[in-house]
């Protein structure tokens, strides 16, 4: 996929801010490039990152039999979480080749490779047949859709 200028700006943002995510978000262990969800059970920022995934998964009623599209998967954090926590199959797509490679490595390290598949693709212009997925997951990534209606 040849990135457009708009896509390249998104890719560049994450490349430039990667060190901040590594430091503040403990990216190497959390795989999260999103904010957390705080309630009375959460005691740390790290827990809040996991809680965000839990709340979204419960709200979406994701089941082990579901096929999930993680639209804007970053380094694979939510995809890996869903595969581990629920056991569903997840396809994660990102604009960034660097994030793709990190997601593949992260999935390998967490032993969820059979359940996850990562690709470089624009979530507003996929090549997936209609109705390929039961759930479309977008944790703090949909804001980057150039055309929200097309998304």
Feature roles, as predicted:
Residues 1-24:
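N-terminal auxiliary segments of SAM/dcSAM-dependent transferases
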Residues 14, 56, 96:
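Conserved hydrophobic/aromatic pocket- or pore-lining residues that grip, position, or stack substrates
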Residues 24-30:
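Short coil/turn segments at secondary-structure boundaries
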Residues 31-37, 43-64:
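Conserved alpha-helix/loop element of class I SAM-dependent methyltransferases that forms part
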Residues 67-69, 75-125:
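Class I SAM-dependent methyltransferase SAM/SAH-binding core
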Residues 124-135:
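A short acidic, Gly/Pro-enriched loop at the edge of an enzyme's catalytic core
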Residues 138-141:
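A short beta-strand submotif of the Rossmann-like class I SAM-dependent methyltransferase core
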Residues 144-151:
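A short, conserved alpha-helix within the catalytic core of class I
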């Amino acid at each position: 996929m040849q990135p457009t200028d708009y896509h390249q700006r998104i890719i560049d943002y994450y490349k430039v801010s990667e060190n901040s995510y590594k430091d503040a978000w403990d990216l190497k262990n959390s795989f999260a490039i999103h904010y957390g969800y705080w309630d009375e059970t959460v005691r740390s920022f790290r827990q809040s990152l996991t809680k965000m995934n839990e709340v979204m998964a419960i709200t979406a009623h994701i089941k082990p039999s579901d096929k999930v599209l993680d639209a804007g998967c970053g380094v694979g954090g939510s995809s890996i979480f869903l595969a581990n926590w629920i056991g569903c199959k997840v396809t994660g797509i990102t604009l960034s080749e660097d994030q793709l490679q990190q997601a593949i490595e992260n999935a390998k390290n967490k032993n969820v490779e059979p359940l996850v598949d990562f690709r470089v693709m624009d979530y507003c212009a996929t090549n997936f047949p209609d109705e390929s997925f039961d759930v479309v997951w977008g944790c703090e990534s949909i804001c980057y859709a150039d055309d929200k209606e097309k998304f």
